[in-house]
Amino acid sequence: MKLILGSGSPRRVEILAVLGLTPDDIRPPDIDEDPLPSELPRPYVDRIIRAKAEAVPSDPGDVVLCADTTVAVGRRILGKPADEAEARAFLTLLGGRRHRVLTGLAVKTDDRLMTRIVESRVKMKRLSKVEMDGYMATGDWQGKAGGYAIHGPAGAFFPWISGSHSAIVGLPMVETAHLLQAAGIEVWKT
């Protein structure tokens, strides 16, 4: 039985390591992650994790783990910004308000597809021009849902979180361990 991580995220590899796991292979799926017209955040995350799990090639007996983290303000999904201008717009929108971070995970075996969605809430402070310019200069906003990663330099902008910190980073530990154990992967095996 091999554990296949369907993600190119180094954070997800790190979180698996905290659980005592090392993926046997890393196979990021190539799917269209654009939201459908009028698609709400939770159904979007559910659709994406299922599509990712189905897109990862696997052999009989393999266990595939995929995840997706989405930032949402109300009904609006904030994906990965296309450029610096969009990242600035996202961070301006998020500044001074609470928003949701939804991380979905899917574990696929030969005969089952198990999913969970973990919703956390965070509040980002309003950024000054100096903070915004400084953060943009780091480039850390690139490739990140909502234009930030809470475990990076942007972590200084969040005075409040409610929920799972590991889910906000990209992989909820409790739910990941539970689903992998249900799939036959032993967590903390020595």
Curated annotation (Swiss-Prot):
One of its GO terms (molecular function) is nucleoside triphosphate diphosphatase activity. It is found in: Cytoplasm. InterPro entries: ITPase-like_fam, Maf-like. It catalyses: a ribonucleoside 5'-triphosphate + H2O = a ribonucleoside 5'-phosphate + diphosphate + H(+); a 2'-deoxyribonucleoside 5'-triphosphate + H2O = a 2'-deoxyribonucleoside 5'-phosphate + diphosphate + H(+). One of its GO terms (biological process) is nucleotide metabolic process. The active site is at residue 68. The keyword Hydrolase applies. Pfam families: Maf. Keywords: Cytoplasm, Hydrolase, Nucleotide metabolism. Its cofactor is a divalent metal cation. GO terms for cellular component: cytoplasm. Its EC number is 3.6.1.9. Transmembrane segments: none annotated. SUPFAM superfamilies: ITPase-like. NCBIfam families: maf. Belongs to the Maf family. PANTHER family: BIFUNCTIONAL DTTP/UTP PYROPHOSPHATASE/METHYLTRANSFERASE PROTEIN-RELATED, BIFUNCTIONAL DTTP_UTP PYROPHOSPHATASE_METHYLTRANSFERASE PROTEIN-RELATED. Nucleoside triphosphate pyrophosphatase. May have a dual role in cell division arrest and in preventing the incorporation of modified nucleotides into cellular nucleic acids. This is Nucleoside triphosphate pyrophosphatase 2. It comes from Jannaschia sp. (strain CCS1).
